[in-house]
Amino acid sequence: MALTAEQKKEILNSYGLHETDTGSPEAQIALLTKRISDLTEHLKVHKHDHHSRRGLLLLVGRRRRLIKYISQIDVQRYRSLIERLGLRR
């Protein structure tokens, strides 16, 4: 269920600004998106897992705040990130 180190490294290499980038909004949003999709799949099977559902809502809120931040900083970076991740806005 949790992301492995290899999965994190792969996501950070494709969405980070440089090789060791872990703190840029793009990298954080990409990692959160992967965690959200994994939790969504878990909740499809375990419908009554309300603790995980609350965690999912917290992750979605954190990602939404980061997306809002990047849209205010640079609209072009925001649009390319949304398109690459396949998110709707």
UniProtKB/Swiss-Prot annotation:
Matching Pfam families: Ribosomal_S15
This protein's UniProt keywords: Ribonucleoprotein, Ribosomal protein, RNA-binding, rRNA-binding
GO terms assigned for molecular function: rRNA binding; structural constituent of ribosome
A single BP term in Gene Ontology: translation
Cellular component GO terms held in the UniProt record: cytosolic small ribosomal subunit
CDD domains documented for this protein: Ribosomal_S15p_S13e
Role, per record: One of the primary rRNA binding proteins, it binds directly to 16S rRNA where it helps nucleate assembly of the platform of the 30S subunit by binding and bridging several RNA helices of the 16S rRNA.
PANTHER family: RIBOSOMAL PROTEIN S15, BACTERIAL AND ORGANELLAR (PTHR23321), SMALL RIBOSOMAL SUBUNIT PROTEIN US15M (PTHR23321:SF26)
Similarity-based family: Belongs to the universal ribosomal protein uS15 family.
Subunit structure, as described in the record: Part of the 30S ribosomal subunit. Forms a bridge to the 50S subunit in the 70S ribosome, contacting the 23S rRNA.
Protein known as: Small ribosomal subunit protein uS15
